[in-house]
Amino acid sequence: VKFLAITLIVHAPDPVTGVRKPTNARFREVIDNALLAEELGFDGFGVGERHERPFISSSPPVVLSHIAALTSRIRLFTAVTTLSLLDPVRAYEDYATLDHLSGGRLELIIGKGNGAAQRELFQVTPEDQWERNAESYEVFRQIWRQDKVTAATRFRPELSEAEVWPRPFQQPVRVWHGSATSKESVDLAARYGDPLFSANVTNPIEPYAELIRHYRERWEYYGHDPARIAVGAGSAGYYAARTSQEAVAAYRPVFEGQLAFQKALGLEPVFPTLEDYVERSSALIGSPQQVIEKVHRYHERFGHTVQHLQADASGLTGAQHRASLELFQSEIAPVLRREIPDPPFAWGPVFAEAVPEASPAPVTSPVPATSLAPVTSAAPAAVTPEQEPEPRPDPAPPSASSSLPAPADR
């Protein structure tokens, strides 16, 4: 099993102290948490994308590019890229550039996004956001795979033999589909043979387990090999200490502060008490053995091979946050890595034959994903660095005075 640390870059008062950090300090905290994740041995670090208060994660490629410059090993995730709000051409340009700068460490989790305010900002309606997401993804994946793209699109100007640069480093980038509440995202992932990442944050696990069950069903319907399924799952919170009593006592003021924040926004808490939160939510709070057992319970329901933890302290002190993550890597992760399998692909840059995959359908007037023809081509397998094909060059090579560093060893 692989472990990610993920942040949505919430910019709100600390749930315990009530102090809100300056914006630049909050960004600095995100960078520090990414460096800590690499130092401690996490397999990936993810940055969300939201375009409304209280989030300041409106530009994940910029944040991830900065992290890429300061790290060398950890894989870099978006969590999620809101393709329903974005021009897929510009999204491709940003992420292909980031993929080169990071030496092929980029992985995308895509989704339609949440929130009425950001839909209004981008003039997207609840009725068309699924079609926008599906169309943007189809165009995005074609650009990543094909040197020239023609697409009769509905939500952006049509493309005719369009060339988009730079050409990609990974061939192709791995794309996960974020899933929280709807079968549309699940079906889109299954249709293309892409991995699924279940949010598993807001509610008890039952609705998430049902969506994952539906994903597996649709995966087989579309003719993909069941052995190639990959599922990731989130957690609502994390704090481990030597004893469960110590963990619960330390986390109680954090939970109570978060509860007060929810009530101030007029939200009805899903978990009204800390005890209920520890028992029924996806939060991993307790002793190392309790955390191990809870992840196993999730694995029995989800069959997931990637688990994410919250990257932020979120009310814990800096010392508590670091000690808890160190405990995770020293006593929890080694056990889970032995007992839960890895995803069915190599954890590294993806390279395949430079032949475009067959597309399931041209992008014309989008229709619901469930009515589209199945795609039976399997996801391209990763190969070892020794087998890596030479990336296709840009039309003109950079000058000798270029200051860009060479890609990291792959």
Regions found by a protein language model. Name each.
Residues 2-25, 85-151, 195-197, 202-207, ...:
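Flexible, glycine-rich active-site loops centered on histidine and acidic residues
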Residues 54-78, 132, 136, 326-340:
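Alpha-helix-loop-beta-strand connector modules within alpha/beta enzyme cores
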Residues 1-71, 75, 171-173, 346-352, ...:
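N-terminal beta1-alpha1-beta2 module of alpha/beta enzyme domains
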Residues 3, 37, 41, 49, ...:
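Conserved, mostly hydrophobic/aromatic
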Residues 13-27, 81-89, 171-181, 279-288:
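Active-site mouth loops of central-metabolism enzymes
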Residues 5, 9-10, 127-164, 205-305, ...:
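An alpha-helical appendage that flanks or caps ligand/catalytic pockets
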Residues 3-5, 45-47, 76-79, 106-110, ...:
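Hydrophobic faces of well-ordered beta-strands that scaffold small-molecule active sites
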Residues 44-67, 82, 114, 200-203, ...:
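Glycine-rich, proline-tolerant flexible connector loops at the mouths of alpha/beta enzymes
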